[in-house]
Amino acid sequence: MDTGKSKDGLKARKDMVQLNVMSQLHPVPTANRKYTLPAACFNLTPDEKRVICTFLRGIKVPTGFSASVKKLVSMKNLSITHCKAHDCHVMLTVFLPIAIRAIKPEFLKMAITRMCYFFSKISQKTIGKEELSDLHEFVVETQNQLEMCLPPAFF
């Protein structure tokens, strides 16, 4: 699970034990001083990955909107690769809130959708001062929701 790039490895889980938070994610000791890491709510099952990748492969976008999403999705590895910055932006603000409807935990869907909405709002050409203060409150609430389901090492 920990490939060196993840913030959800054994060290992060041991930190959770020391902090006495998220007991459902604490590592479970097995034989020979090894540990098993329980699946977190943000881990997608292969079926959920397949549904999301199938949805993304089926998207057709107008010329110039973004790259062909079909070329970025690998059904073999159930992953998204080779995205340029604009493609990531479009994926985050437009496609992700729709694609995650297939995942189970409702609170996680809500937090991710709120995050996508925030990025969509701050990427607009003009933002009013009152809108900025509303967005500040909104992003603080969203961060609190994300802190409830993601490990502390993520932040």
Task: Annotate each PLM feature.
Residues M1-F155:
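A structural signal for the principal folded core domain
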